[in-house]
């Protein structure tokens, strides 16, 4: 039987993993309007815990980049079936690890800028500026990575092909702008939910 501290510890790992999975699913389905805000809400909710940030990023990339598994089999390149399977899974896990690492680093920035004090007691203007800066940092990071061969899909670009309205909005603010907007929405959902719990 699990004791309360073990249950709490499991939740700290389970929810970030679930958030990453929902985010990864959202980039490949028409349910992004439901899944992505929930995913980013979970990201913000656990952003003060470093391992939670890593778990979210790891599972987001693991699911959203699962198409890498379609590289298998690589037998036409001379690899055996087993070697091809190992190589393909290794590539996917490596990309997922990098995704987790990047979100982990972003989480460190969140910890430094945002979590030094209780966000629910901050004045709205300083809070908004800090959250906008953190969201902008993510968007700029995606923009920089998109210029390299090591970046295939992100929060901004992933949803555009499946939604004509987002595609139109992206013409005005770009994929990075969409990324910033989504992260901002995720934060305010987290903030409103947190305030509602405080006042219950």
Which stretches of residues belong to each language-model region?
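Membrane-embedded alpha-helical bundles of multi-pass enzymes
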Residues: 2-198
């Amino acid at each position: 039987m699990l004791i309360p501290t073990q249950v709490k510890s499991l939740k700290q790992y389970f929810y970030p993993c679930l958030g990453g999975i929902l985010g990864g699913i959202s980039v490949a389905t028409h349910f992004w309007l439901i899944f992505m805000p929930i995913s980013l809400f979970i990201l913000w909710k656990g952003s003060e815990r470093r391992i939670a940030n890593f778990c979210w990023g790891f599972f987001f990339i693991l699911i959203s980049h699962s198409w890498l598994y379609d590289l298998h089999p690589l037998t036409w390149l001379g690899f055996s079936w087993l070697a091809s399977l190992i190589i393909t899974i290794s590539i996917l896990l490596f990309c997922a690890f990098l995704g987790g690492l990047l979100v982990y680093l972003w989480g460190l920035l969140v910890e430094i800028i945002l979590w030094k004090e209780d966000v629910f007691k901050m004045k709205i203007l300083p809070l908004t500026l800090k959250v906008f800066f953190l969201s902008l940092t993510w968007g700029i990071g995606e923009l920089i990575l998109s210029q390299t061969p090591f970046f295939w899909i992100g929060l901004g670009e992933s949803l555009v092909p499946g939604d004509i309205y987002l595609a139109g909005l992206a013409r005005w603010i770009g994929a990075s702008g969409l990324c910033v907007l989504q992260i901002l929405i995720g934060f305010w959902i987290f903030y409103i939910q947190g305030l509602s719990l405080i006042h219950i």
